[in-house]
Amino acid sequence: MGEFNEKKTTCGTVCLKYLLFTYNCCFWLAGLAVMAVGIWTLALKSDYISLLASGTYLATAYILVVAGTVVMVTGVLGCCATFKERRNLLRLYFILLLIIFLLEIIAGILAYAYYQQLNTELKENLKDTMTKRYHQPGHEAVTSAVDQLQQEFHCCGSNNSQDWRDSEWIRSQEAGGRVVPDSCCKTVVALCGQRDHASNIYKVEGGCITKLETFIQEHLRVIGAVGIGIACVQVFGMIFTCCLYRSLKLEHY
């Protein structure tokens, strides 16, 4: 009877080892995906960060990059801990899983919270950012972001083209008689912003604020879904780790 129980325990341990190894392979790939989403956000989708008053959007992306990197390292550690049957490594692996779990939950919560407050933030700050910083010394990133925003989304001004009447640059001699930036024009040529007729510039209902809000919200949904989704998967990893740790402890005795 004792021999049967011992074989049963050993068989259970082997099954757990292979189950945890398979999980770690998938977990490593998930870490790569998380890091890729973070880098994708920072490298390709961060053009408009200079237009945002809050750093939350940027913070969520950095958290995903860090979490993804740690996930990949942890996945390798998990494989080593599993096949070497080292309980101290399993403890470390579990702690790292818990840390990553918390990081991804935080990223998901930040993305969701910022999603809720984005409309208010843009309404309060976007017009001031565009009119007070556009073409001003030291704000080249804002100038570039505004021009790209207006060209990419075919819009002009925060709410409408009339917003540019309050622009410090438009009211200066440097504007060369423009009433809107050239990036508002349907066909961009030098000094095309001198005429703000509908046939010449983009007049979109809701202005650039609506377009930017939709753009940011779409990416916040991706960040939030990835963060929360991977965090949920990690719960199974922690359960498998606890089961294997307990199984090894029983065999030890």
From Swiss-Prot:
Location relative to the cell: Cell membrane
Covalent lipidation (S-palmitoyl cysteine), chain numbering: 11, 15, 242-243
Segments on the Extracellular face: 40-57, 113-221
Tissue: Expressed in a variety of tissues including vascular endothelium and epidermis. Expressed on erythroid cells, with a higher level of expression in erythroid precursors than on mature erythrocytes. Acts as a sensitive T-cell activation marker.
Up-regulation conditions: On both CD4 and CD8 T-cells following TCR/CD3 activation.
CDD domains found in the cross-reference section: CD151_like_LEL
Main location: membrane
Keywords assigned: Blood group antigen, Cell membrane, Deafness, Epidermolysis bullosa, Glycoprotein, Host-virus interaction, Lipoprotein, Membrane, Palmitate, Transmembrane, Transmembrane helix, Ubl conjugation
Protein name: CD151 antigen
Recorded consequence of changing residue 17 to R: Complete loss of RNF128-mediated ubiquitination
Family membership: Belongs to the tetraspanin (TM4SF) family.
Cytoplasmic side: 1-18, 79-91, 243-253
A matching Pfam family: Tetraspanin
One GO term (biological process): positive regulation of endocytosis
Keyword Membrane: yes
Function summary: Structural component of specialized membrane microdomains known as tetraspanin-enriched microdomains (TERMs), which act as platforms for receptor clustering and signaling. Plays a role in various cellular and molecular mechanism through its association with both integrin and non-integrin proteins. These interactions facilitate critical cellular functions, including cell-to-cell communication, wound healing, platelet aggregation, trafficking, cell motility, and angiogenesis.
Subunit structure: Interacts with integrins ITGA3:ITGB1, ITGA5:ITGB1, ITGA3:ITGB1 and ITGA6:ITGB4 and with CD9 and CD181. Interacts (via the second extracellular domain) with integrin ITGAV:ITGB3. Interacts with ITGA3; this interaction modulates ITGA3 glycosylation pattern. Interacts with F11R. Interacts with RAC1 and CDC42; these interactions mediate physical association of RAC1 and CDC42 with integrin adhesion receptor complexes.
Transmembrane portions of the chain: 19-39, 58-78, 92-112, 222-242
Record: disease: Epidermolysis bullosa simplex 7, with nephropathy and deafness: A form of epidermolysis bullosa, a genodermatosis characterized by recurrent blistering, fragility of the skin and mucosal epithelia, and erosions caused by minor mechanical trauma. EBS7 is an autosomal recessive disorder characterized by the association of skin blistering, hereditary nephritis, sensorineural deafness, and beta-thalassemia minor. Skin blistering is present at birth, particularly in the tibial area but also scattered on other parts of the body.
Modified how: Palmitoylated. Palmitoylation by ZDHHC2 regulates CD151 expression, association with other tetraspanin family proteins and function in cell adhesion. Ubiquitinated by RNF128 on lysine residues present in the tetraspanin amino terminus via 'Lys-48'-linked ubiquitin leading to proteasomal degradation.
